[in-house]
């Protein structure tokens, strides 16, 4: 819907996930799987100015209209890599998992930029921590042998309200 009223969008990469009919616009929309066939393992570095825009992320608008916050390349990347290494004490071989929403600055910083700049193994999760039951986070920790787990206190409190029986079946010994 949004792209119908935004003619400035030149390309849209579409990933098929649900097997539902997808309305594609010729010349603009391309399939992810087709584009991936064109990719090589060689990815030359693009030299950027330190103050070049890296991305714009919009605020929630909780105090009014959402505002686009532009983050610069060097400052943001240096900060997220440094804070990731020092706050989470990541070591090579660790499996790190931040449960934040990737559309928020915490998700951007500690799912994508910080871990990848540090060469870390980072996990992404799509869904809610209570589906199919309140043991979902702990199931993922066990299955993937997560060492470092970062989530919000509100998430833990909401799961805690469901009781500790959802935690007990899982082996959490991989956590530091």
Predicted regions and their residues:
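Short functional hotspots where side chains directly engage DNA or cofactors
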Residues: 59, 70
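Residue(s) in the substrate-gating loop at a strand-loop-helix junction
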Residues: 101
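A structural motif corresponding to the C-terminal end of an alpha-helix
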Residues: 2-9
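Conserved AMP-binding/adenylation subdomain of ANL enzymes
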Residues: 77-95, 105-148, 161-164
